[in-house]
Amino acid sequence: MKAKGLVLLLVFIALLSAKAIGSAKLHKSFAGLTYSTVSMRSSQKITILDGIYKRYSNSEKVVGHRLAKSELSMLSQLVGRIDLSKINDLEVPSKRYRFDGAMLAVIEVQIGQKVYVSVPFDHDNPPSQLKPLADHLSSMHL
């Protein structure tokens, strides 16, 4: 009976430890995030650094504020789904940005001191691996 209780206690402690480690990893997954789009006539840039969201239009700051922990958690999850070591080698579905048929877009993710820069892609047609993050960042008109 004591052995069964001890096993249950150890399983419970292991689960709590795993959750705490996962939670710490989630909140430290990225230090900075940038989503930039540019065409011949305009540019947009979204930066998230130390939990502060800033959006620029044609190099002028439009809005800036601190993100809620839930929003940072969502962004961390989306970033966590991307293989950052291959972010600059992804296959893009279209390249209309080359003749200004679409806005050129790039995503940059900073983890620690390392910055991962995506392959350039059409703003409205990102690579499938970047689509959830790109769509979420594009919809953040806060």
Model-predicted segments: where are they?
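A short, sequence-level motif marking secondary-structure junctions
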Residues: 50-53, 68-71, 120-126
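Mature extracytoplasmic domains of secretory-pathway proteins
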Residues: 62-91
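Short small-residue beta-strand/loop micro-motif enriched in glycine and branched aliphatics
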Residues: 55-58, 116-118
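Short, well-ordered, aromatic-rich surface patches in folded extracellular/luminal domains
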Residues: 3-5, 20-38, 76-78, 89-142
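Bacterial N-terminal signal peptides
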Residues: 8-15
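N-terminal export/targeting and maturation segments
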Residues: 18-56, 62, 66
